[in-house]
A protein has these predicted regions:
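Internal active-site segments that recognize and position negatively charged phosphoryl groups
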Residues: 250, 254, 304
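Generic, well-ordered alpha-helical scaffold segments in large soluble proteins
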Residues: 110, 114, 130, 134, ...
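Conserved short alpha-helical segments that host acidic/polar catalytic motifs at enzyme active sites
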Residues: 1-245, 249-250, 258-294
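Glycine-rich phosphate-binding loops that contact phosphosugars or nucleotide phosphates
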Residues: 291-381
């Protein structure tokens, strides 16, 4: 899963961007990059490999800027190379992107016919060229972004800057997570709040279709109908959110050794000593709903998928309920038949895995009995 960080501030934002990327490393990635505006020019550094390699390059080049965007990439379109790393640039426009542009091949063909040259294999470069094309028509960045996204099919989150606008960052959320962090005289965007906790604990959780205009002293949110809207800010306890490795060599080792405590914390407050569930933890009528379950469908990706297979043994061996486990990326694209008495269980560390969310949306269309989502981020989608 990729990660986005963006900042508009009076101070140099490069350290904020790098620290944000480090705090998103738990998502996994194969390359990283950032871009800032300095003296009306875009300064970009990208590296395949670890964020620390990008950090060294940024320090050596003495990159400095009061506005910038950064990204960790997990390759989907194109190999994990420096040329494919974000941000991508078209003219004076720089873009970072999470998600998948499903019609990128058609857009690439169209843009090539209009004279645009592609230097990467990514779907993201299409977005940069689209914004540049629309900017040539409108001469206004916000209007250009709004027009460009009308051509995009898929799920995406975007962060966009323009060299001539050192005080404004444009962001978009459509089917891929993005939050706004609120500071004092500075504002931020991130794929999740973990990336921004060193600089703020006040967040606005965006909705699909939102286009956001960030300045140092203000933010403006336009909804899917292009109306200006106000969204409530949430204040988080930073102590409750940890992304460090706690002395372990890597996150996998940390998570392996944390399993006993994680299981205990998960059960506490949800299962009573009598063995009955605490309905308040699962929502109203939970016991009645669970009693009606005759089949369980588990959907997940990666190691969450492996955890789902462990759960299958428990559901069938202990509860005596039939259970099926499937990879979300396979499930969402096939025609599936679910019994009406199915409990649809999704597992996602971040609560934002795109394929898992898409699978859940498809299942809800079928009229399942209920859904149960297991994740580490209560404020996620």
């Amino acid at each position: 899963m990729c990660g986005i960080v963006g900042a508009v501030a009076e101070r140099n934002v490069t350290a904020i961007l790098i620290e944000g990327l480090k705090r998103l490393e738990y998502r996994g990635y194969d390359s990283a990059g950032l871009a800032v505006i300095d003296n009306a020019s875009i300064v970009r550094e990208r590296r395949s490999g670890k964020v620390k390699e990008l950090e060294a390059a940024v320090e050596q080049a003495q990159v400095n800027g009061h506005i910038g965007i950064a990204h960790t990439r997990w390759a989907t379109h194109g190999a994990p190379t420096q040329d494919n790393a974000h941000p991508h640039i078209s003219g004076d426009v720089a873009v970072v992107h999470n998600g998948i542009i499903e019609n990128y091949e058609e857009l690439r063909t169209e843009l090539r016919a209009q004279g645009y040259v592609f230097v990467s294999q990514t779907d993201t470069e299409v977005v940069a060229h689209l914004v540049h094309r629309e900017l040539e028509k409108t001469q206004e960045l916000l209007a250009a972004v709004k027009e460009a996204i009308k051509h995009l099919d898929g799920a995406y989150a975007l962060g966009i800057i323009h060299a001539s606008e050192p005080e404004r960052l444009i962001a978009v959320r459509q089917g891929s997570p993005l939050v706004v962090g609120l500071g004092i005289g500075e504002n931020f965007i991130g794929s999740d709040q973990l990336a921004l906790l060193p600089v703020t604990n006040r967040f606005i959780y965006l909705e699909d279709g939102d286009v956001i205009e960030l300045r140092r002293e203000s933010i403006t949110i336009y909804d899917r109908y292009d109306s200006v809207v106000q969204r409530d800010a949430t204040e988080l306890d930073a102590q409750l959110h940890h992304s460090d490795k706690a002395g372990y060599r890597h996150y996998m080792l940390k998570e392996i050794y944390e399993q006993p405590q994680a299981i205990q914390r998960t059960l506490e407050g949800r299962i009573q000593e009598s063995g009955l569930i605490n309905e308040q933890a699962f929502g109203g009528n939970a016991a009645e709903i669970f009693a009606k379950v005759k089949h369980i469908q588990i959907i997940a990706c990666g190691t969450s998928y492996h955890a789902g297979y462990v759960a299958r043994y428990w559901f069938e061996g202990i509860a005596g309920v039939s259970c099926n486990v499937e990879v979300a990326s396979e499930y969402r694209y096939r025609t599936s038949i679910l019994p009406a008495d199915t409990l649809f269980v999704t597992i996602s560390q971040s609560g934002e895995t795109a394929d898992t969310l898409a699978a859940l949306r498809e299942a809800k269309k079928q009229g399942i009995l209920a859904s149960l989502c297991i994740c580490n981020v209560p404020t996620s989608t």
